[in-house]
């Protein structure tokens, strides 16, 4: 099996060692569910399947910024294949200074296609051409291998400069290998800026998300794939040493289907729409690099401020907003600057710090301390606030930030006025602010 097919077929995604100097490998539950919380994404299992790091269900042991450590019971083991032929050589992510240089050179070779300009300037987002240029949004390249080749020429023809940069990897062909950039051609690249205005990653927004399969409670060698969009799937299983097709049909979205063979349950499969916003990563690909260790935060400021923010300059703010989604945070920062009074700007600020998910709130601590933040206002999408996992994470975050001398507010509003802070502000409303005590 080629490296590309191996990466695409995985239900577990390899991540780097969680401990320096350790040979223990960890794998993220990508297209299968975590046995602890029953959800996909964020959670990880080690290569002996004896430990799980769950990002949602707490335990007595906090495992760094990743989540909580759980010991795997025998009946929770699923018998995944962790053999060496499942491993792919990837590289440790380079520092933010280097990422910024390479990503900036990469963006210089890209342009904006009409469909993305129309999407950003439309009534739903109302982003001007000037702001599009200032924020350096770009369309994903149609021929990423050519763009990567051009970048390699810019850095003196040395591929070593792009190794260790998430997104870049070596593609395997019958004629050899060449470097290219991972992602979807039908997407918009959204730069992630750190507290020094360095581009340290990208999210990409997919124009037309496709359906994908998720499996749970399954036996080894149980696999499910979408063979025809939107909803025709095929399930395969190894029987007497041979991979056999045991189910092929159209299925309903979000329904769990139990798959049996000769009276024995083999697993369950669900069809769901892939996320519209995805991190640029080449983890699990040959000479690729994962986006984590650590995951990037994104610091969104109004475009008038971004124009004058020098690269490498530490941003200092007394007050910030905390939200999710980099594009949404860019829009929120722009509209906070327009809608808030001068007094409100002094009280709450117009800087929005975007995190990859509320469960990874720990990655906020050091950046907020370096920024000199005294007060943070959480403004998560209103449909998330009733989620018990979100509530627990917010409480833990508030307690930790309070211990660091940072007071916490929460923003709330009628969901009928907009799901997210960006939607609310675009409808010319501002949220109610409450203090967490």
Segments predicted by a language model, with ranges:
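TOPRIM fold recognition
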Residues: 1-13, 32-35, 43, 53, ...
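Non-catalytic accessory segments of DNA primases and related replication-initiation nucleases
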Residues: 1-187, 209-234, 242, 248-252, ...
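Short capping/connector residues at structural and topological boundaries
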Residues: 145, 300, 426-429
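Glycine-rich, histidine-containing beta strand-loop boundary motifs that form or position
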Residues: 46-47, 203, 380
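Residue-level marker of positions within ordered structural domains that often coincide
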Residues: 39, 59, 125-126, 195, ...
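Short, charged/polar, Gly/Pro-enriched secondary-structure boundary elements
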Residues: 60-64, 199, 429-430
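Phosphate-handling DNA/RNA-contact segment within nucleic-acid enzymes
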Residues: 151-371
């Amino acid at each position: 099996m080629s490296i590309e097919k191996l990466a695409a077929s995985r239900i577990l995604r390899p991540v780097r060692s969680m401990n320096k100097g350790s040979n223990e490998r960890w794998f993220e539950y990508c297209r299968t569910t975590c046995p602890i919380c029953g959800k996909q994404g964020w959670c990880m299992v080690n290569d002996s399947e004896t430990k799980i790091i769950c990002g949602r269900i707490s335990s007595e042991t906090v495992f760094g910024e990743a989540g909580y450590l759980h010991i795997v019971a025998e009946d929770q083991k699923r018998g995944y294949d962790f053999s060496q032929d499942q491993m792919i050589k990837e590289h440790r992510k380079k520092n933010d200074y280097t990422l910024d240089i390479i990503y900036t050179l990469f963006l210089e070779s890209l342009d904006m296609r009409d469909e993305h300009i129309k999407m950003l300037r439309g009534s739903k987002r109302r982003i001007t051409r000037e702001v599009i240029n200032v924020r350096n949004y770009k369309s994903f390249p149609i021929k990423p291998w050519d763009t990567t080749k051009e970048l390699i020429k810019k850095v003196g023809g040395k591929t070593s400069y792009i190794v260790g940069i998430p997104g870049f990897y070596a593609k395997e062909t019958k004629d050899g290998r060449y470097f290219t950039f991972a992602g979807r051609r039908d997407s918009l690249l959204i730069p992630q800026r750190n507290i020094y205005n360095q581009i340290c990653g990208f999210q990409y927004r997919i124009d037309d998300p496709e359906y994908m399969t998720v499996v749970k409670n399954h036996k080894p060698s149980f696999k499910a794939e979408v063979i025809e969009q939107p909803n025709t799937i095929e399930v395969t299983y190894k029987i007497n040493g041979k991979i056999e097709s045991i189910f092929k049909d159209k299925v309903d979205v979000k329904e769990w289907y139990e798959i049996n063979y000769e009276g024995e349950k083999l697993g369950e499969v669900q069809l769901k729409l892939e996320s519209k916003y995805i991190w640029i990563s080449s983890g699990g690909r040959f000479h690729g690099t994962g986006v984590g260790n650590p995951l990037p935060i994104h610091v969104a400021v109004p475009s008038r401020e971004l124009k004058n923010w020098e690269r490498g300059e530490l941003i200092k703010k007394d007050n910030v907003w905390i939200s999710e989604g980099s594009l949404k945070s860019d829009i929120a920062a722009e509209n906070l600057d327009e809608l808030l009074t001068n007094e409100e700007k002094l009280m709450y600020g117009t800087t929005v710090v975007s995190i990859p998910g509320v469960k990874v709130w720990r990655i906020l601590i050091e950046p907020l301390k370096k920024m000199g933040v005294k007060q943070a206002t959480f403004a998560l999408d209103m449909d998330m606030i009733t989620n018990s996992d979100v509530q627990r994470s917010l409480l833990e975050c508030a307690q930790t930030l309070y211990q660091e001398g940072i007071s916490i507010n929460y923003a709330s509003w009628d969901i009928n006025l907009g799901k997210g802070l960006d939607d609310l502000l675009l409808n010319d409303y501002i949220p109610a602010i409450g203090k967490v005590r």
